[in-house]
A protein has these predicted regions:
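Structured, active/binding-site neighborhoods that engage oxygen-rich ligands
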Residues: 1-260
Length: 260
């Protein structure tokens, strides 16, 4: 059983990285008609499209998006520090995405003045998006809280696999996920949505895929940490009501609504 659990832990990390790379050539296509046309051309297997159709940036197929690269930095920090060290994660993130990095281009300069010449898209190379730009500026200003307080995009969910894999089943898991998320996104809505996703991933890491994690009429017998043993980490936030249906999670009750 221990070997199976170890396989699921590794699988969560590798699976997230592979999925990110597989989707990268089709990243950020916001035009539904354009995306539908491309998918129709690709057939049933659009993964790892050889030619990028990304309208904002172009990277070689197999490379990560800005989200996958954040997950890599988080994984590296967790391994080197044998756990979450926010200060180390901040420094590694700054080095990976900051001055002199592959992400450091004139187009994605955090201090780039508005109203300049129109940028020709897509650019060659990775894209440094809003939360990372805000993070870099907060680091430059010497702030302790480095995350962007207005960004509520998908970063937290996309990069959570390493930290959930390390702390799955432990009382401090939610606390660690929140701390890692707030390094670049200091936004409550972003945090609570990420925590909900973390509970789903934790469930499957600990229990496998044989049992459904969705809404059920009977109590789940999965052995997950209950609320009395787990750090608060936004559990009672108003936005978490949609996550109450996760059996065995910190908010799970026998009627799928009872907060413990």
């Amino acid at each position: 059983m221990a070997v199976v659990l170890a396989d699921r832990i590794v699988g969560a990390i590798i699976g997230a990285a592979v999925a990110d790379a597989a989707a990268q050539p089709l990243h950020w296509i916001y035009n539904p008609e354009k995306l539908s046309t491309i998918l129709a051309q690709e057939g049933p297997c659009p993964e790892f499209r050889p030619q990028s159709a990304n309208p904002f940036y172009r990277r070689e197929t197999g490379q990560q998006t800005c989200y996958g690269d954040q997950a890599f930095v988080l994984l590296e920090s967790l391994c080197e520090c044998r756990g979450l060290d926010v200060g180390d994660l901040q420094q590694r993130t700054y080095k990976f995405f900051g001055p002199g990095s592959e992400y450091d281009t004139p187009v994605n300069d955090p201090y780039r003045a508005r109203g300049g010449p129109r940028v020709q898209l897509p650019i060659e190379g990775p894209w440094r998006h809003a939360s990372l730009k805000s993070f870099l500026k907060n680091m430059d200003a010497g702030k302790t809280e480095t995350g962007c307080d207005i960004d509520n995009q998908i970063d937290g969910i996309a990069k959570l696999a390493p930290v959930v894999a390390l702390y799955a089943g432990k009382p401090e898991m939610l606390e660690k996920v929140e701390a890692a998320t707030r390094v670049t996104q200091n936004n409550d809505l972003c945090v609570v949505v990420t925590l909900a996703a973390a509970r789903f991933l934790e469930y499957y890491i600990l229990n496998g895929s044989g049992q459904s994690c969705g809404r059920s009429h009977s109590p789940c017998k999965a052995k997950l940490i209950q609320g009395s043993q787990r750090a608060d980490s936004q559990c009672f936030h108003k936005h978490m009501s949609f996550a109450w249906c996760i059996p065995g999670s910190a908010t799970w009750g026998a009627d799928s609504r009872q907060v413990r």
